[in-house]
């Protein structure tokens, strides 16, 4: 929607439904989920002439706009989602735009160490993220906190992480590795503590406080013939102390 003063607003709701039957009436087996419900505001007149002139404000429950994956094998490179608010496309300088967001997620119904049991077996996880673009380069920085997650009983004496750090350096190429027409993306991700689930930010509360992981993702697409494309991809990951064993 475009207002009289030129400001634009967009409202989105996304539903997901899980069923395990082929029948036409599935109400008894259906699991309906509101996956996204959020609003965006852009082209605000009060931002004219500032670094926020082309920015978009948002709030609600959503999948982050700048997530990306290898869609044909259904594998995320980076996925950030939850309930939150933020701003996209701040023009910090020439060839430098930045996104700032805060997301919240929940860890529910986890076992608690007996000596720390206060009757609470859930907590909220908060993610503060900044996503920066310098031409084709992307630098993403994330900090995570989940109060009392360290009271989670992991089973063998390790302490669950109640905080974490995560970073991703990515390059979005506009050719097939410089060899021909097409595109490619490469990303190097590293996380510690709650950030050690490097492709799903803040999604795993079972990570230990000593957890660390580094992941490399590379993929590209190009045409071998007018109706024939090739799309190679490579994943590699090294991790330590992610789970209590």
Could you describe each region identified by the protein language model?
Residues 1, 30-35, 79-83, 120-126, ...:
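Residues that define the transmembrane beta-barrel architecture of outer-membrane proteins
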Residues 22-29, 70-77, 111-119, 150-160, ...:
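Outer-membrane beta-barrel domain signature
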Residues 1, 9, 35, 89, ...:
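Polar/charged side chains located within well-ordered beta-strands of beta-rich proteins
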Residues 10-17, 52, 57-64, 70-72, ...:
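Transmembrane beta-strand segments that form the barrel wall of outer-membrane beta-barrel proteins
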Residues 1-49, 98-100, 131:
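Beta-barrel outer-membrane channel/assembly domains of diderm bacteria
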Residues 50-129:
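Internal, well-ordered domain-core segments that constitute the primary functional module
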Residues 1-2, 37-41, 85-89, 126-132, ...:
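Residues on the lipid-exposed face of transmembrane beta-strands in outer-membrane beta-barrel proteins
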Residues 95, 133-148, 156-245:
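Detector for outer-membrane/organellar transmembrane beta-barrel domains
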């Amino acid at each position: 929607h475009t207002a009289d003063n030129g400001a634009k607003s967009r409202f989105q709701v996304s539903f997901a439904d899980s069923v395990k039957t082929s029948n036409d009436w599935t109400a008894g087996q259906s699991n309906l989920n509101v996956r996204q419900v959020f609003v965006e505001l852009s082209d605000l007149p009060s931002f004219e002439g500032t670094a926020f002139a082309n920015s978009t404000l948002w709030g609600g429950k959503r999948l982050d706009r700048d997530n990306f994956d290898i869609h044909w094998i259904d594998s995320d490179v980076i996925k950030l989602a939850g309930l939150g608010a933020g701003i996209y496309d701040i023009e910090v300088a020439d060839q430098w735009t930045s996104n700032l967001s805060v997301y919240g997620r929940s860890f529910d119904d986890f076992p608690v160490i007996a000596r720390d049991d206060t009757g609470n077996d859930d907590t909220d996880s908060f993610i503060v993220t900044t996503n920066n673009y310098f031409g084709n380069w992307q630098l993403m920085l994330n900090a995570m906190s989940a109060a009392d997650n360290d009271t989670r009983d992991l089973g063998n004496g390790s302490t669950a992480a109640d905080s974490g750090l995560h970073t991703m350096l990515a390059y979005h190429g506009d050719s097939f590795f410089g060899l021909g027409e097409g595109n490619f993306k490469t990303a190097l991700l590293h996380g510690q503590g709650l950030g050690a689930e490097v492709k799903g930010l803040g999604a795993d509360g079972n990570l230990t406080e000593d957890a660390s992981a580094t992941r490399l993702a590379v993929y590209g697409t190009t045409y071998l013939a007018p109706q024939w494309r090739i799309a190679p991809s490579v994943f590699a990951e090294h991790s330590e102390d992610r789970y209590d064993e």
